[in-house]
Amino acid sequence: MTKKLYKIAVLPGDGIGPEIIQEAYKIIDVLQKKFSFNVKMHEYDIGGISIDKHGTALTQETIEGCENSDAILFGSVGGSKWDHLPEIEKPEKAGLLKLRKHFNLFANIRPCKLSQHLLDISPLKNSIIKKGIDLICIRELTGGIYFGKSNKITNIDDPYAFDTEIYFRSEIKRIAKIAFQIAQSRKKKIVSIDKANVLKSSILWRDTVNKMAYKFPNVKLEHMYIDNATMELIKNPSSFDVILCSNLFGDIISDECAAIIGSIGLLPSASLNKSGFGLYEPAGGSAPNIAGKTIANPIAQILSLSMLLKYSLHLPFLSSCIDEAVHEALVKKYMTMDISKNPQNFLKTNEIGDKISDLLAKKA
């Protein structure tokens, strides 16, 4: 193992964030002791806790700390405590979204995997998921309807509101390229999601993706309307490999993936820019209703660390070791409350972190 020193900015945030980050620290500790992983970590405030301590959800200190790091390991932000704030000052928008914008993190990568040994976790029938699920959702993260012109007019007899979806070809092109590159290392199959029978932005999306496909002749491309895709994902999830989506459609599809495998607590995610710098976080939110109860599922946080090692630090072996340890833990039925079939028999947050750490240590 190389002795190169890696730097990770750790942003625990709010809610369950600090709890599940602690379990990721256990994994890093094993990597340091057993695999000679040389890393320096530094924690920074973000979100609600940053508002409470510094008056803003994202401080210059946090931004600079992230700039001086190789990657960001992120917990979660938000909670009812800050709901009274104006929209632009809330932890999510003023913290996480601002951070994504600052680093131009345009590509969201969210794996969705459920092995044949764990079919009982999924709410779907075994006959539907008997082959297991192994897909990855690639979502454009900085364009589309969430960033287009919008307004709400209420001081008239018939109030109205509007949102505008805008996509530049360059935005579509760069996310499509990442999807095709990832597909090349998998089953060489992409399903691109759009609504090209209705939306002009989707027509441009489809045309751009088609043009990108010419550069990757060994990858099979299929287009699917969003309404049909949501249905097919339930009917035959094992037929999907790489799913390419706009911001809005990716928001929908990626959460459907969480439902299919049984818990959003199992889904990690990566948000990358063109240089490979990334922010890695669980797909779920801050879950303030369970914060402090030691029942949060830390697996998504641990798998987010695995993605960080793979995509930003380019250490695929260490990433694979973590993935295998998590898989073994689930096969052994080490489960948190959200995925346990027996509500009286489950492991606490710290307990499953210990189990996964022990399994990882045995791989050294």
From Swiss-Prot:
Its EC number is 1.1.1.85. NAD(+) binds at residues 79-92, 285-297. SUPFAM superfamilies: Isocitrate/Isopropylmalate dehydrogenase-like (SSF53659). Mg(2+) binds at D227, D251, D255. GO terms for cellular component: cytosol. One of its GO terms (molecular function) is NAD binding. The keyword Metal-binding applies. The keyword DNA repair does not apply. Gene3D superfamilies: Isopropylmalate Dehydrogenase. Homodimer. This is 3-isopropylmalate dehydrogenase.
